[in-house]
């Protein structure tokens, strides 16, 4: 598996983890957990963009 594909898989994992935390924070009225989820999703989006750039440069 290429580095770009590995990064893409990690990015998807971070986005899923972030969405889960965000939803859990909403369900339990936990603003800190919700913020963590949004941060994790943003990290996943950034990593996804980097992975796309790596894949397009090959």
Curated annotation (Swiss-Prot):
InterPro entries the UniProt entry points to: CsbD, YjbJ_sf
Region entry Disordered, spans: 1-58
Superkingdom: Bacteria
Bias-annotated ranges (Basic and acidic residues): 1-22, 30-46
Coiled coil: none
UniProt cross-references to Pfam families, sorted A to Z: CsbD
Family: Belongs to the UPF0337 (CsbD) family.
The protein's name in its UniProt record: UPF0337 protein OB2685
